[in-house]
Structures are given as structure tokens and as C-alpha cells.
């Protein structure tokens, strides 16, 4: 019996079409049996002082998790907190102070329950340009120069954690911020990187920044603020409740707590939170 080629090809074409549709469905649905998996794009909001550390850690993480893309938004913790509250897409937030994280938790219920951790600790330090024309060598001498009115200090503004720590230090010495401002003795940066740049470029006589930023900029830390002067400098981190990639965000946060990331953090000057 002779079989028509047309009659034979029709069911074969149907079978081929079904296989293609099935394969496409598997890929679109992220089926583990599909030929490839869907990649995740994580948006990480992080304090500006974490820039160098996270960029280096990201390279290591991409080797371990090639299907996860990391997009960083570095700025002051106060600015990032406001962006999150205004609806910006963010999967993971790393703040330079508990204050901004607390506000996200209490004011807008933005944090994924039980994902928040204290990740790192830093130190607040005094730096000057390499010339150090004012011969500042300690917070004590900085305070004396400010009282004498013969120095320009760079610090973060009031919604930047680095600025808030600086204000505590100046208050500890009995200095009044309004008086310092009225005499033109302070200049502000919108984040700690701007403050660091002002000192590095010599546009300010001294600056109050983090130990890690001093290290990255090659500026010697002339003095370190005690916990009594400004409190403990803790960096909390949390997955956001609104994240579309909560598992991947938690996985990256776990990696940041692990030994490979720890080695990078500690080399730059951070310590892991207790």
C-alpha cells in the first residue's frame, strides 16, 4: 500500500510544532527541565561608603551566580531611604546607620520580616589634605581650631549618617553647629564620598569621614572617634518586602555575610558586626 507523502508530513509537522511550543513554554515558565533558566536582576541600594567593597565583591559573586545580575545604587543612606519610601525598585538595602533602616521598618513597613541583620561596623576618623597646613593631628586640635575660627571643616549634611556622626563629635566638644555655620567654618557634602573629595582636593582643611573611605582615598586617619563620642557605627542590611526577587536577594545577603566577602570588607577597613 502506497502512503501519500502529504498525508505523512502533516502529522509530523503537528508533532514538531507541539514540541516547539512545549519547549518555549518550559523556557518562559522557568521550568528546571528547560534548556536555560531565567536570570534575575537584583537592584541593591547601598551607602556610598560601601562602593569599593561591593563592586569588588560583586565580581566574585557573578562567578558563583552567573544568572544573577547586580545593579548598584550608591548614595547617602538618607537619600536611598527616601527613594525606597517613594516607590523606587529595590531588592536589598544596606545602610550606614540603623536610623534609616529603623525608619523603613516603622514608618513604611518596607522590610522583609526576619531578613534584617547587622552586617558591618566602621569607624569615624579625622583626615586632612596631605599638606595639612593647619597642623591638625587629632579631634582635640580640630576642636581648638574651630573654637578659634581659623579652619574649614568638611562633613556630611544632617541627613547623611557620616554627617550625623560628625555632629555628635562636635557636640561632644561643646561646639554649636549653628554658630559654626554662621562663621563659615563648615562645608557640607551630600554623601561621604563628596566629603572625602573635598579633603583630597584641598578645598577643606579637614574632614570627618569613615575609616574605609580614608583607606580608599589614600588619606591617613589622624584620629579615630571613640564610641563615647559618636556611638557605634553599625551597617544594617535587609531584603525589601516589595522585592520581586526575595530569594536571590537573601542569597546575596548571605554571601555578604560569608568568608569571601568578609575578606574584602576587612581588607578595606570594615569589621563584621558582632
State what each model feature region is.
Residues 42, 68-70, 124:
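Conserved beta-strand core positions
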Residues 59-72:
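Signal peptide-proximal N-terminal region
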Residues 113:
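Active-site phosphate-binding/coordination module
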Residues 74-81, 90-104:
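Ligand-binding clamshell of periplasmic/extracellular solute-binding protein-like
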Residues 24-59, 78, 85, 97-98, ...:
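Exported/periplasmic ABC-transporter solute-binding proteins
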Residues 3-28:
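Sec-dependent N-terminal signal peptides of Gram-positive bacterial secreted proteins and lipoproteins
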Amino acid at each position: 500500500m502506497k502512503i501519500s507523502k502529504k498525508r505523512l508530513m502533516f502529522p509530523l509537522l503537528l508533532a514538531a510544532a507541539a514540541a516547539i511550543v512545549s519547549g518555549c513554554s518550559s523556557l518562559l515558565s522557568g521550568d528546571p527541565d528547560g534548556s536555560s533558566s531565567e536570570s534575575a536582576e537584583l537592584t541593591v541600594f547601598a551607602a556610598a561608603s560601601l562602593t569599593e567593597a561591593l563592586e569588588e565583591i560583586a565580581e566574585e559573586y557573578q562567578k558563583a551566580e552567573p544568572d544573577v545580575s547586580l545593579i548598584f545604587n550608591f548614595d547617602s543612606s538618607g537619600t536611598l531611604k527616601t527613594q525606597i519610601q517613594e516607590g523606587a525598585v529595590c531588592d536589598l538595602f544596606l545602610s550606614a546607620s540603623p536610623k534609616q533602616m529603623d525608619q523603613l521598618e516603622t514608618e513604611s513597613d518596607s522590610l522583609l520580616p526576619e531578613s534584617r541583620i547587622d552586617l558591618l561596623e566602621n569607624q569615624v576618623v579625622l583626615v586632612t589634605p596631605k599638606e595639612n597646613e593647619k597642623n591638625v593631628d587629632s579631634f582635640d586640635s580640630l576642636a581648638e581650631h574651630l573654637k578659634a575660627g581659623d579652619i574649614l571643616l568638611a562633613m556630611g549634611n544632617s541627613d547623611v549618617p557620616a554627617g550625623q556622626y560628625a555632629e555628635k563629635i562636635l557636640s561632644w566638644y561643646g561646639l554649636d553647629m549653628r554658630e559654626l555655620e554662621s562663621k563659615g567654618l563648615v562645608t557640607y557634602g551630600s554623601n561621604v564620598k563628596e566629603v572625602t573629595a573635598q579633603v583630597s582636593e584641598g578645598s577643606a582643611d579637614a574632614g570627618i569621614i569613615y575609616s574605609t573611605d580614608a583607606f580608599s582615598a589614600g588619606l591617613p586617619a589622624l584620629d579615630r572617634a571613640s564610641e563615647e563620642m559618636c556611638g557605634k557605627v553599625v551597617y544594617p542590611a535587609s531584603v525589601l518586602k516589595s522585592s520581586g526577587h526575595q530569594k536571590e536577594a537573601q542569597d546575596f545577603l548571605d554571601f555578604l555575610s560569608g568568608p569571601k566577602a568578609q575578606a574584602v570588607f576587612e581588607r578595606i577597613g570594615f569589621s563584621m558586626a558582632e
